[in-house]
């Protein structure tokens, strides 16, 4: 079953980030093929409450249309105009503080395991949280290869690398060494 982006909105409370709005987004497409044994999966994006309403308002008003329109003596697409305005406004400043929050919930065989991540801008290294959580994960993967822990050839999605316990544990330890912490709870 495929659900449209921005659908199935729900509010979620996070200890450090507060109340956030979760909604369906399009991503992790490789999971459909690599984790076919899992009957139900969802991926949701988290934003501050009200984000979806603003995006829907822009969409319904035509700001994401790609067909060019005439404005005075200029022809341009609403999407190009919107992108030009919003991308510069949304671009993170060099030392602007931000955070990353993630929750992974795995349910099956009568138990639930939850992984929670909260990370924020590191003023000591002047490294954004997004760089810390994604970049360090990529460099951990490079280290897996250089240390001979992952020797497969070709392109591999992250879930196939993480499917190996020694690789999964290595990545989590690598992140921990850089003060990126996951909390695991079981229930």
Model features per residue range: what roles?
Residues 1-187:
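C-terminal catalytic/substrate-binding lobe primarily of soluble NAD(P)-dependent oxidoreductases
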